């Protein structure tokens, strides 16, 4: 449950259980509630996954909207129901109490938020092969992990966005740092163009990449 008692939906491939030994691909959208492009991508992906269940061999977990409080707010907010930027709240070795503004508030302590705690627990429980989270800002594929990770290249080839090693500025307490540096789980961050007027174009940008994965 979110800080405002909203349910956070989770879906997974029918052949797997939420326990160790399945090494799924763990994916999520809506980390920042004011980035609807990431939710649109997750929803398109979920439709495709459910329509092609018998063809997909990979184990997968998908959370369409992690920050349901921020996404449901009017206006939508980057932060969660407690005013915390979830992608600055992971218990990473580089977590910092400092932030460059209210939108980036990292929380009172590392891993303080229920959404972050749920992802950390899910990572420990299922030991994902790698993770993909969906955002929107400037178009790019951010890979924190082995530079030859083929899945990142599939996505890059599908959408035409370059693979970058970081977003271009420090992100203490981020999933990228916690996942790869601290846990050795490769992290792919999809950054779609922000403020799109037509969200229906998002899923087609990445469909071929996910089919190849």
Feature-to-residue mapping (PLM):
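A broadly conserved detector of short glycine/acidic/proline-rich loop/turn motifs that flank catalytic sites
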Residues: 14, 90, 193-194
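Active-site-adjacent mobile loop/cap segments within catalytic or ligand-binding domains
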Residues: 141-143, 170-213
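Active-site/substrate-binding loop(s) of hydrolase catalytic cores
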Residues: 3, 21-26, 35-167, 185
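Short glycine- and acidic-rich boundary segments immediately preceding or forming the N-terminal edge
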Residues: 1-14
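A short acidic-Thr-Gly-centered motif at the start of a beta-strand
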Residues: 13-21
